[in-house]
């Protein structure tokens, strides 16, 4: 093929993307045609000339990752996946944005083959990609050997003005530059338009200088519609191994639409039939909607090339298995997300024999002891903290800070809670590592949307959230969580653990690590908490999220508590016993898991008709659904105060005497 023919082919391939996007949005009567049309050449050059992938196997471990951070441009990705040969037939493109279709409004992991991450909240895809690139670097350092580059791929990102306006982009890109993630390549769709109009009025940053200051390699002022310029920029980016690269692509939003290109009206609404007809005429595109000319379909088909690339890697991996059998076995185990046999043995031994884990201990310290036992058995654990390591106690003796060379198992994320959480999602998405990260519970608000995305994507991610209540004392209401546990419990598919002692903390960690279909939040105390004795059945029932910790014959009331308030409930039960009132105590470290149990078990723990009192140093409205209309929820429905912890518990009425008195009043009113 000579140069003019190649240019013509490239243009037709790009136009196929334009028309599939425009026609799908038109049929759906909603969507975002402008960005897919403006990024068509960017996509054509990357996907046809650079991206290493195999449509027949979207899970090939050494594939390049592609992230569409500006997820509203989803029809661009669907068109690419269809044209290159993924299992996404044209019938699904026709069903764009329809119920149960494989082409939802924004890309969703697990719904569409070839989609690497769920995107839509701007900036999060970019931060996910930072996590993916970090995972690639760490795994390459772990598994590659001379002559055997088993882990050797790039992470590519498409992003727009909106992604860069989000504060998350600063957190993630600053971290990427610091860690020198040289195989992260971002293509910036610099079209100068957002929903409200021209961004010059609200986004006048010098983006190239901004990223240069982060330590990135910047390729500025690339014509985003010039295939040759884009190709050259990508070659330059791939040659840069020590710094992430930003390619600034000047584009026209909605390019190809004769009357609407370049304006904000094309961002988030169908073009309209007359405009699409005019575009077909202007671009000489004779194919009917949802039809791709044979020559264009052939030019896009990546199945043979993808199969050949994976076959070459497989052959190399076979040789790797022969040369490094133990490493190869470990690589396969971790790539498949399987935990090693007996990984929990040392931790369980701490519960079976006298150990500090069974003493009076802050649950944040208990968590650290759990990690000390687990880390040697789980090399895939990748820890970290948002500059609170000494407070969260997320590090262990075996922790090695991640360095520029990609060695280590602990990331100092800096004061970047949102960036940490979103990067952890990317690490989990990549595979081969299980990320956990720590911050103060009150700062989980910074991370919340990334935690929500982890729940939506069903990712194994662990958030260590310490200083969980007024128990942290004098730092005051800015640092004392009140509504946070309830807020996190509201996220579907998120499990929130608030353990009361070392044993519950150990079971919380085991549940979080064994959980393959969603994130877990470990809500841990600053202050030391009393341990509780349990028989084997009680200990096993911790894993069910809620269980009877103290039982009595013919109980008249059930006291339900979590975390540091379990001790208060136990002491209140003793006070009630002195008054002749039999009280059962239920510890409920994970409400979501408890309510996932069968009704029969739940009724044995919380017998219907028995009055209930809940005790938690946080908002009470969540617990009203647990205790019922006739029950009583004790907690804190205002902000905290700055004072010693003991004074605060007295001030807010969270003492054994207060709880016992409330239970007596409840029984008198029943």
Curated annotation (Swiss-Prot):
Keywords: Calcium, Calvin cycle, Magnesium, Metal-binding, Thiamine pyrophosphate, Transferase. Pathway: Carbohydrate biosynthesis; Calvin cycle. PROSITE patterns: TRANSKETOLASE_1, TRANSKETOLASE_2. It catalyses: D-sedoheptulose 7-phosphate + D-glyceraldehyde 3-phosphate = aldehydo-D-ribose 5-phosphate + D-xylulose 5-phosphate. SUPFAM superfamilies: Thiamin diphosphate-binding fold (THDP-binding), TK C-terminal domain-like. GO terms for cellular component: cytosol. Mg(2+) binds at residues 161, 191, 193. Binds 1 Mg(2+) ion per subunit. Can also utilize other divalent metal cations, such as Ca(2+), Mn(2+) and Co(2+). It is an enzyme of class 2 (transferase). The record marks 32, 267 as: Important for catalytic activity. Belongs to the transketolase family. Catalyzes the transfer of a two-carbon ketol group from a ketose donor to an aldose acceptor, via a covalent intermediate with the cofactor thiamine pyrophosphate. Homodimer. This is Transketolase, chromosomal. It comes from Cupriavidus necator (strain ATCC 17699 / DSM 428 / KCTC 22496 / NCIMB 10442 / H16 / Stanier 337).
């Amino acid at each position: 093929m000579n140069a003019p023919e190649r240019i013509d082919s490239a243009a037709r391939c790009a136009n196929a993307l334009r028309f599939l996007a425009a026609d799908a949005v038109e049929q759906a009567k909603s969507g975002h045609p402008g960005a897919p049309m403006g990024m068509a050449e960017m996509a054509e050059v990357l996907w046809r000339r650079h991206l290493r992938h195999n449509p027949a196997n979207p899970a090939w471990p050494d594939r390049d990752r592609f992230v569409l951070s500006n997820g509203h441009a989803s029809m661009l990705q669907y068109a690419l996946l269809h044209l290159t040969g993924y299992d996404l037939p044209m019938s699904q493109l026709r069903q764009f944005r329809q119920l149960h279709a494989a082409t939802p409004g924004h890309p969703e992991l697990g719904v569409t083959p070839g989609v690497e991450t769920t995107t839509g909240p701007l900036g999060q895809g970019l931060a996910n990609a930072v996590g993916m690139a970090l995972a690639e670097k760490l795994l390459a350092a772990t598994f590659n050997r001379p002559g055997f580059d088993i882990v050797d791929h790039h992470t590519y990102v498409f992003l727009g003005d909106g992604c860069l306006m989000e504060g998350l982009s600063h957190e993630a890109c600053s971290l990427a530059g610091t860690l020198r993630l040289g195989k992260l390549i971002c293509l910036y769709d610099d079209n100068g338009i957002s929903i409200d109009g021209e961004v010059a009025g609200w986004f006048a940053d010098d983006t190239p200088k901004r990223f240069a200051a982060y330590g990135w390699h910047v390729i500025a002022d690339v014509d985003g519609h010039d295939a040759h310029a884009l190709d050259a920029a990508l070659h330059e980016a791939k040659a840069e191994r020590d710094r992430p690269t930003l390619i600034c692509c000047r584009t026209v939003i909605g390019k190809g639409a004769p009357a609407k290109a370049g304006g904000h009206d094309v961002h988030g609404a169908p073009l309209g039939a007359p405009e699409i007809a005019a575009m077909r005429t202007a671009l000489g595109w004779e194919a009917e909607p949802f039809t791709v000319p044979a020559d264009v379909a052939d030019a896009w088909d990546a199945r043979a090339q993808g199969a050949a690339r994976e076959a070459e890697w497989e052959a190399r991996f076979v040789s790797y298995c022969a040369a490094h059998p133990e490493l190869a076995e470990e690589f396969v185990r971790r790539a498949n997300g399987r935990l090693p046999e007996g990984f929990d043995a040392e931790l369980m031994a701490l519960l079976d024999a006298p150990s500090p884990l069974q003493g009076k201990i802050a649950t944040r310290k208990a968590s650290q002891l759990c990690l000390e036992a687990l880390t040697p058995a789980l090399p895939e654990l990748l820890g970290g903290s948002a500059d609170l390591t000494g407070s969260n106690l997320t590090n262990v003796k075996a922790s090695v800070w991640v360095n520029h060379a990609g060695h280590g198992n602990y990331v100092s994320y800096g004061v970047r809670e949102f960036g940490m959480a979103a990067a952890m999602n990317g690490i989990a998405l990549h595979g081969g590592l299980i990320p956990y990260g720590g911050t103060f519970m009150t700062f989980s608000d910074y991370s919340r949307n990334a935690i929500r995305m982890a729940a939506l994507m069903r990712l194994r991610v662990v958030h260590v959230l310490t200083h969980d209540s007024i128990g942290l004392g004098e730092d005051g209401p800015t640092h004392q969580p009140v509504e946070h546990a309830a807020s996190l419990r509201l996220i579907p598919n998120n499990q929130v653990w608030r353990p009361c002692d070392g044993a519950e903390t150990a079971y919380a960690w085991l549940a979080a690590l064994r959980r393959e279909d969603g994130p877990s939040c470990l809500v841990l105390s600053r202050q030391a908490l009393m341990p509780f004795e349990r028989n084997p059945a009680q200990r096993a029932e911790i894993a069910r999220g809620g269980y009877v910790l103290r039982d009595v014959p013919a109980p008249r009331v059930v006291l339900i508590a979590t975390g540091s308030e379990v001790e208060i409930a136990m002491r209140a039960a003793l006070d009630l016993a002195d008054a002749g009132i039999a009280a059962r105590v239920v510890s409920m470290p994970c409400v979501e898991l408890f309510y996932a149990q069968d009704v029969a078990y739940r009724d044995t723990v919380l017998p219907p008709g028995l009055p209930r009192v809940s005790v938690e140093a946080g908002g009470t409205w969540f617990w009203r659904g647990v205790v019922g209309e006739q029950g009583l929820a004790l907690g804190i429905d205002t902000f905290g105060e700055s004072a010693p912890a003991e004074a605060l518990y007295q001030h807010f009425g969270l003492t054994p005497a207060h709880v016992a008195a409330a239970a007596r009043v409840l029984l008198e009113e029943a």
